[in-house]
UniProtKB/Swiss-Prot annotation:
The keyword rRNA-binding applies. Keywords: Ribonucleoprotein, Ribosomal protein, RNA-binding, rRNA-binding. It comes from the Bacteria. GO terms for biological process: translation. It comes from Aliivibrio fischeri (strain MJ11) (Vibrio fischeri). One of its GO terms (molecular function) is 5S rRNA binding. GO terms for cellular component: cytosolic large ribosomal subunit. This is Large ribosomal subunit protein bL25. This is one of the proteins that binds to the 5S RNA in the ribosome where it forms part of the central protuberance. InterPro entries: Rbsml_bL25/Gln-tRNA_synth_N, Ribosomal_bL25/Gln-tRNA_synth, Ribosomal_bL25_short, Ribosomal_L25_dom, Ribosomal_uL5_bac-type. The gene is rplY. Part of the 50S ribosomal subunit; part of the 5S rRNA/L5/L18/L25 subcomplex. Contacts the 5S rRNA. Binds to the 5S rRNA independently of L5 and L18. NCBIfam families: PRK05943.1 (NF004612).
Length: 92
């Protein structure tokens, strides 16, 4: 599975709300020897793949042209809507 990701320049609650309103959601990639990277992912592309078992094993994120292999570490969902609020990915 491969997803396109964009590095986030704005941080905070307001920036995250603007992302969600635009059909994206914030996420972070951490682990390994590299520094953590805040990214934004397309909500519809990710939510449609989350019901597949392969999603939780290994994912390739294309972050500014570089391919990073990750695994979902944590998913924060909306309380009653079928929406993802935030995701944590760990490098593998």
């Amino acid at each position: 599975m491969k997803f396109e990701a964009v590095v986030r320049t704005e941080q905070g609650k307001g920036a995250s709300r603007r992302l969600r309103h635009a059909g994206q959601f914030p996420a972070i990639v951490y682990g390994g020897t590299e520094a953590p990277v805040s990214i934004a992912l397309d909500h519809d592309a990710v939510i449609n793949q989350m019901d597949k078992p392969a999603f939780y094993e290994a994912i390739e994120l294309v972050i500014d042209g570089a391919v990073v292999k990750v695994k979902p570490q944590d998913v924060q969902r909306h309380a009653f809507k079928p929406k993802v609020e935030h995701m944590d990915f760990i490098r593998i």
